[in-house]
């Protein structure tokens, strides 16, 4: 029930990764990357399926060898989401996966050899209508740039990015996006700010090698939150030393918190104190797990007492305000006659949320059908 995001997004060109639009006002996409051995087709496909279940838009797969390229062919055949092939050094791998239907190539043109080889890859991408991501990383800058700046700086990452952009510009290829990732939040943020002023191509956001699930999520939320709040960014990946499924969840949570793109339940819950009339923490934890399958955007407030509960419920799709034995229930900001038994709160609230989601989905389908009929 909250208003749309006030963020004005940076204007950028449009590319397509498979059928997924990126840039030019398209919804900001959430990506992840497999961490299985690509040659283990079954394990890689299983991980992609798990990512699909939590709503991933695009998945990147490392393709370091020709054997991995052959495996990629089989993986692609069994995947429903667009796949990006991550390739370094050997340009022939890029040519091979292009034959196998890759949706995007993640390369740095400067590290795959001579201009003739670069031209071969770009011509192949052009022929198959495959976009390219230029992926600059603070940990792998070119030797001459490292010597020039002494250490990774925003200016160093920008120079590296523009060097690769210029290569594609000279080859008259404009179907690309760019990233300038670093593990340091300030370095990454300031690098993206500089790059956003130089080009109008879509930008892929990320804090690279951010850390474990907790610390990496915090770094990513701060870094990407700063950029997204300034309108910078067209697609993102949360880089965690954790299950890739967690990357997708955190990515959507960041977009949801800025009201940029909502997917599933936005829980509003108090940290609890001695005034709570039911087990708020247990209720929230249980419902987050039970309702992971819902994709309908909804605000659900779960507040343990009447101090802030009614106010939060007024701006929530579903709201609960704690009271002794039986807690107050709100729907669309209106208090209902029905009350929840505090001992059966979880089951009752889950049922109400699912029923509301079904109703909202049905209403949306009616609106879509009416628009299509026009």
Curated annotation (Swiss-Prot):
The keyword 4Fe-4S applies. NCBIfam families: ispG_gcpE, PRK00366.1. Pathway: Isoprenoid biosynthesis; isopentenyl diphosphate biosynthesis via DXP pathway; isopentenyl diphosphate from 1-deoxy-D-xylulose 5-phosphate: step 5/6. Binds 1 [4Fe-4S] cluster. Its cofactor is [4Fe-4S] cluster. It comes from Yersinia enterocolitica serotype O:8 / biotype 1B (strain NCTC 13174 / 8081). It catalyses: (2E)-4-hydroxy-3-methylbut-2-enyl diphosphate + oxidized [flavodoxin] + H2O + 2 H(+) = 2-C-methyl-D-erythritol 2,4-cyclic diphosphate + reduced [flavodoxin]. GO terms for biological process: isopentenyl diphosphate biosynthetic process, methylerythritol 4-phosphate pathway; terpenoid biosynthetic process. Pfam families: GcpE. [4Fe-4S] cluster binds at residues 270, 273, 305, 312. Converts 2C-methyl-D-erythritol 2,4-cyclodiphosphate (ME-2,4cPP) into 1-hydroxy-2-methyl-2-(E)-butenyl 4-diphosphate. This is 4-hydroxy-3-methylbut-2-en-1-yl diphosphate synthase (flavodoxin). InterPro entries: Dihydropteroate_synth-like_sf (IPR011005), IspG_bac (IPR016425), IspG_bac-typ (IPR004588), NO2/SO3_Rdtase_4Fe4S_sf (IPR045854). PANTHER family: 4-HYDROXY-3-METHYLBUT-2-EN-1-YL DIPHOSPHATE SYNTHASE, 4-HYDROXY-3-METHYLBUT-2-EN-1-YL DIPHOSPHATE SYNTHASE (FERREDOXIN), CHLOROPLASTIC. Its EC number is 1.17.7.3.
């Amino acid at each position: 029930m909250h208003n749309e995001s006030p963020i004005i997004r940076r204007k950028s060109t449009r590319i397509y990764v498979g059928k997924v639009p990126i840039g030019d006002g398209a919804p900001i996409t959430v990506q992840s990357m497999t961490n299985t051995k690509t040659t283990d087709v079954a394990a890689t496909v299983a991980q992609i399926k798990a990512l699909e279940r939590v709503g991933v838009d695009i998945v990147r797969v490392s393709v370091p060898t020709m054997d991995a390229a052959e495996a990629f062919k089989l993986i692609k055949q069994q995947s429903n989401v667009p796949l990006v092939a991550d390739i370094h050094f050997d340009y022939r791998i890029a040519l091979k996966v292009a034959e196998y239907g890759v949706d995007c190539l993640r390369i740095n043109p400067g590290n795959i050899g001579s201009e003739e080889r670069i031209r071969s890859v770009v011509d192949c991408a052009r022929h198959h209508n495959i976009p390219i991501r230029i992926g600059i990383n603070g940990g792998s800058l070119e030797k001459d740039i490292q010597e020039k700046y002494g250490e990774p700086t925003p200016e160093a990452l920008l120079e590296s990015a523009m060097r690769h952009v210029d290569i594609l510009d000279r080859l008259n290829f404009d179907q690309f996006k760019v990233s300038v990732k670093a593990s340091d939040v300030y370095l990454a943020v300031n690098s993206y700010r500089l790059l956003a002023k130089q080009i109008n191509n879509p930008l892929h956001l990320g804090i690279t090698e951010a850390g474990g699930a907790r610390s990496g999520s915090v770094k990513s939320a701060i870094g990407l939150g700063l950029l997204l709040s300034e309108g910078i960014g067209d697609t993102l990946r949360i880089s965690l030393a954790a299950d890739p499924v967690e990357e997708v969840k955190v990515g959507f949570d960041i977009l949801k918190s800025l009201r940029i793109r909502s997917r599933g339940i936005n829980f509003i819950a108090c940290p609890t104190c001695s005034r709570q009339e039911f087990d708020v923490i247990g209720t929230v934890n249980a419902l987050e797990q039970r309702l992971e399958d819902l994709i309908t955007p909804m605000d659900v407030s779960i507040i343990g007492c009447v101090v802030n509960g009614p106010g939060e419920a007024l701006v929530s799709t579903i709201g609960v305000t704690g009271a002794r034995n039986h807690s107050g229930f709100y729907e669309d900001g209106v208090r209902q006659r029905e009350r929840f038994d505090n001992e059966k709160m979880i089951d009752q609230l889950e049922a109400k949320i699912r029923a509301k989601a079904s109703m909202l989905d049905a209403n949306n389908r009616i609106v879509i059908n009416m628009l299509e009929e026009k």
